[in-house]
Curated annotation (Swiss-Prot):
Residue numbers annotated as active site: 69 (proton acceptor)
UniProt-recorded name of the protein: Diacylglycerol kinase
UniProt xrefs under Pfam families: DAGK_prokar
Keyword hit for Metal-binding: yes
Alphabetical list of PROSITE patterns matching this protein: DAGK_PROKAR (PS01069)
UniProt similarity note: Belongs to the bacterial diacylglycerol kinase family.
Function summary: Catalyzes the ATP-dependent phosphorylation of sn-l,2-diacylglycerol (DAG) to phosphatidic acid. Involved in the recycling of diacylglycerol produced as a by-product during membrane-derived oligosaccharide (MDO) biosynthesis.
Residues bound to a divalent metal cation: 28, 76
Organism: Haemophilus influenzae (strain ATCC 51907 / DSM 11121 / KW20 / Rd)
Recorded topology in the membrane: Multi-pass membrane protein
Entry's Gene Ontology molecular function annotations: ATP binding; ATP-dependent diacylglycerol kinase activity; lipid kinase activity; metal ion binding
Cofactor(s) needed by this chain: Mg(2+)
Annotated compartments: Cell inner membrane
Catalytic activity: a 1,2-diacyl-sn-glycerol + ATP = a 1,2-diacyl-sn-glycero-3-phosphate + ADP + H(+)
Length: 118
């Protein structure tokens, strides 16, 4: 298989990333919800954050949730591709992916709560 380099590699990588975002938005309800919330929360950071670092932390915490949701969706897709029958390892993989999103949501709560209330 021919491996691209340079500008061609960058263009192809960007194309594949955009395809992944489009696929997640089309197929994953949770990702659509998180995109909707990000469209509200990210602009709010410029009004609620008092310093540049607060704004950066608030935006980064929201984007972290979205990134982990993409990884969680990828894990679920691969597990479902392997087979739809119940298996302990498949369940653990899906649960752990979900737990990573939950922890990211806790981080959002800590960051936003810490900035807004302390």
């Amino acid at each position: 298989m021919y491996k691209t380099t340079g500008l061609t590699h960058l263009i192809n990588s960007t194309k594949y990333s955009l395809q992944g975002l489009k696929s997640a938005f089309k197929n994953e309800t949770a990702f659509r919800h998180e995109c909707f919330l990000a469209c509200i929360l990210i602009p709010l950071t410029f009004f609620l954050g008092e310093t540049k670092i607060e704004i950066i932390l608030m935006i980064s915490s929201v984007l972290l949730v979205m990134a982990l949701e993409l990884l969680n969706s990828a894990v679920e897709t691969v597990v479902d591709r392997i087979g739809t029958e119940r298996h302990e390892l498949s369940g653990r993989a899906k649960d752990q992916g979900s737990a990573s999103v939950f922890i990211a949501l806790c981080i959002v709560g800590i960051v936003w709560g810490g900035i807004l209330f302390f």
